[in-house]
Amino acid sequence: MSSARNYRYIVRIAGTDIDGSLKTVYGLAEIKGVGVNLAYGICRRLGIDPEMRIGYLTDEEIKRIEDLLSNPSAYDIPSWMLNRRKDYVTGKDMHLIGAELIFYVKQDIEREKKIKSWRGIRHALGLKVRGQRTRTTGRLGLTVGVRKKRR
């Protein structure tokens, strides 16, 4: 391990502040759009120890991580690890992180609503989209209590 003077309590990667005491894999998973599996893949590709605390990463290692996140295909990250394969508009495999991911998801939901697909209708009505039951769960509004019958 590096000396204590190289330790950072907060590390900023891809616009996200990460607690320096987390292991590298779990620290990277704090970034929206990066899960634990992709974080292990990043560590393996860049030769970073996944068990090392993220606060001990050098500036050069952080720069390489950010470069990989912005262009994963250049580092031979397999397409099944990316979170937006065969994009609706471009047809390319992409990996989105942070605010860009949130924007694209909202755009997808709006497109579903516009074409009035089943999923879009469910989103528009505020109901569950993925086939879950709705009879008893997911109820909104105030609860109506049951009163005991008076004699």
Curated annotation (Swiss-Prot):
Gene3D superfamilies: 1.10.8.50, 30s ribosomal protein s13, domain 2
InterPro entries the UniProt entry points to: Rbsml_uS13_C, Ribosomal_uS13, Ribosomal_uS13-like_H2TH, Ribosomal_uS13_archaeal, Ribosomal_uS13_CS
GO biological process terms, semicolon-separated: translation
Residue runs in coiled coils: none
A cellular component annotation (GO) from this entry: cytosol
Ribosomal protein found in the keyword field: yes
Domain of life where this protein originates: Archaea
Pfam families per the UniProt record, alphabetical: Ribosomal_S13
GO molecular function annotations of the record: rRNA binding; structural constituent of ribosome
Alphabetically ordered keywords of this record: Ribonucleoprotein, Ribosomal protein, RNA-binding, rRNA-binding
Cleavable signal peptide: none
Function: Located at the top of the head of the 30S subunit, it contacts several helices of the 16S rRNA. In the 70S ribosome it contacts the 23S rRNA (bridge B1a) and protein L5 of the 50S subunit (bridge B1b), connecting the 2 subunits; these bridges are implicated in subunit movement.
Record's subunit section: Part of the 30S ribosomal subunit. Forms a loose heterodimer with protein S19. Forms two bridges to the 50S subunit in the 70S ribosome.
NCBIfam families named among the record's database cross-references: PRK04053.1 (NF003140), uS13_arch (TIGR03629)
Family of the protein in this entry: Belongs to the universal ribosomal protein uS13 family.
Protein name (Swiss-Prot/TrEMBL): Small ribosomal subunit protein uS13
Species of provenance: Staphylothermus marinus (strain ATCC 43588 / DSM 3639 / JCM 9404 / F1)
Lineage per the UniProt record: Archaea, Thermoproteota, Thermoprotei, Desulfurococcales, Desulfurococcaceae
Gene assigned in the entry: rps13
